[in-house]
Each structure stands twice: as C-alpha cells, then as structure tokens.
C-alpha cells in the first residue's frame, strides 16, 4: 500500500511519540485531578498506543509501582526505557536495582537505561557505576545507556566527560534553553538519541485557568501566549505538541496520560498541521517543576 507524503508525515509524527508511565505508579502533575491510573485503564492505553504505532515506554524504579504494573499487563511489544536507583547505597545496589527492574518488567533485556539523578556524577563511585552500566550494555542486557538531565550546564559536562547513547531532557515552548545554548545541536553531532520530556510542563501549558497562586508571577506571559495560540487556530494541546514534534534534532517526544481518551486527543493533535514557535521564559522557577512551591 502506497502512502502519500502527507500521510507519511502524519505517521512519522505519531511514531515520534513515546509514552511516559509515571502516572501508572504515582499521582503526578500539578493539573492531574484523577490520581494514579487504574490497571484496566492502563491496558486500554497500551493497546491503543500499540495500535497507533507508539512503541516506546519510559518508566523508572522511582515511579511507584509502574514497573510492576507494566510487567503485569505485558509489554513485550514495546521498547522499554527505565532509570537507575539511587547510588547512595553503592554501585552494587544500583546494579541489583537494574536486575530487579528486569524482573518487575518481565523482560530479559531493555532498550535503554538512564542515570536518574544527574547529581550522582559528583559521587566518588560514579565512574565505577558508569563502567558497570557499560558492562550491562556489552552483555546485551541494555541497548543504550545515558542520562536524564535538567539544565544546559549538565549537558555541557556530560558531553565533555562521557560517551553515551541517549539523553532525556526538558523541552517545551517556554523552555528552549538547550536550543538557544547549542546543546541540542552538539548532542546530534555525536548521534546521541534525544528524548524530550515536560513538553506540556506537567500540564501547565494545557490549562492556565486552574493553576495555583504560585504561577501568578507569570500570568501576563501566559495571557500573551494564549492570545498567540488562539490566533494560530490551534488548541493549547495542539500548539505545544506541534512545537516539540517539529523541532529538529528531537527523536522522541514523551507524553504522559491518565486515560485512553487523553492519548486519543494527543494522537489527534499530532496530526494537526500548523506552525508553532518558541515563547521562551528563562526563569528556572517556572521551568523546573522540582522548584515549584505548590
């Protein structure tokens, strides 16, 4: 069957999506009103994702019981990316944690393993840990190793000091620091696979009307942004998603959902043609959810 250029583009957009699973194990997101996702709903979400060409799941041992849930419902048809446990109890415990993740996920190997806490690079045992992760890769237990990061400075440090395969980083219409600083381009020069998370800024970019008073500092910027989105003819969801999907260099765009219906809306939005642009707000108190006082 032949596919038109337009149809191929839409398929590429959808296949660029990856499914985050933190909501499967934890209450997550400042706009999340429904809490942790029920297992029956998770099965529906995964079935719908698979039928629409989404084949990457992102999880972590720190996401509550999400690994156990995924292993229970069955994820053999997916490429799995998980993250390390804390290094504070030693390298051996991190490696044990990886094998526990394989057991929970009911997998013999996975696609990717990320260092979850980037600050651990300062630990005296980190070089040993990274060497052990490379050994897991050589043994065929994991295909790619890399990092989950928060700032451009962290990317600079990693590029100077480590050879790695994959990175997960924050990116959205408000947070384009890694484009402006050139880090995205440097990562691609080294053929490092780039996964963008926080494309909806934990839901902030989808609903400006029901935010806590913490976000009042940026109310004027939010209002101006909403005016731009309205003029574009796109919804808030379509605009934010379009921006991430169409940014050169980003290989996968992570989205998290609480229901099959939300995933349907995201996939439909990925098909929307339109032009969105960056609206940078260079304030880490907004861009880094770990700093939010909500």
Regions found by a protein language model. Give the residues of each.
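Acidic (Asp/Glu)-rich catalytic clusters
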Residues: 70-79, 99-108, 158-162, 186-189
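Beta/alpha (TIM)-barrel catalytic core signal, keyed to glycine-rich beta->alpha loops juxtaposed to Asp/Glu
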Residues: 118-287, 291-293
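Active-site groove signature of glycoside hydrolases
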Residues: 103-121
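A structural motif
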Residues: 51-54, 107-110, 142, 164, ...
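Short, acidic/polar
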Residues: 34-48, 90-105, 150-157
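Active-site mouth loops of central-metabolism enzymes
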Residues: 27-39, 83-92, 122
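A short, structured active-site edge motif that brings together acidic residues
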Residues: 77-90, 112-116
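N-terminal binding-site loop/beta-alpha segment at the start of enzyme catalytic domains
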Residues: 2-78
């Amino acid at each position: 069957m032949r596919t038109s250029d337009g149809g191929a583009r839409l398929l590429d957009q959808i296949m660029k999506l990856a499914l985050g699973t933190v909501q499967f194990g934890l209450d997550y997101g400042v706009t999340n009103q429904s809490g942790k996702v029920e297992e029956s709903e998770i099965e529906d979400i995964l079935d719908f994702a698979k039928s629409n060409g989404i084949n990457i799941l992102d999880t972590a041992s720190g996401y509550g019981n999400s690994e156990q849930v995924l292993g229970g419902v069955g994820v053999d048809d997916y490429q799995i990316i998980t993250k390390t446990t804390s290094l504070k109890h030693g390298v051996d415990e991190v490696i044990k944690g990886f094998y526990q993740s394989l057991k929970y996920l009911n997998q013999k190997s996975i696609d990717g393993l990320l260092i979850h806490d980037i600050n651990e690079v300062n630990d005296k045992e980190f070089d040993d840990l990274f060497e052990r992760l490379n050994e897991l890769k050589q043994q065929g237990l994991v295909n790619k190793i890399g990092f989950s990061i928060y700032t451009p400075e962290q990317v600079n440090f990693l590029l100077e000091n480590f050879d790695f395969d994959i990175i997960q980083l924050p990116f959205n219409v408000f947070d384009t620091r890694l484009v402006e600083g050139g880090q995205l381009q440097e990562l691609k020069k080294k053929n490092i696979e780039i996964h963008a998370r926080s494309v909806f800024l934990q839901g902030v970019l989808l609903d400006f009307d029901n935010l806590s008073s913490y976000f009042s500092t940026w109310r004027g910027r939010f209002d101006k942004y909403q005016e731009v989105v309205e003029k574009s003819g796109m919804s808030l969801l379509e605009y934010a998603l379009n921006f991430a999907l169409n940014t050169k260099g980003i290989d996968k765009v992570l989205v998290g959902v609480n229901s099959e219906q939300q995933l349907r809306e995201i996939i439909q939005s990925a098909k929307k043609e339109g032009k969105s642009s960056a609206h940078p707000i260079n304030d880490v108190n907004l861009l880094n959810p770990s700093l939010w006082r909500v």
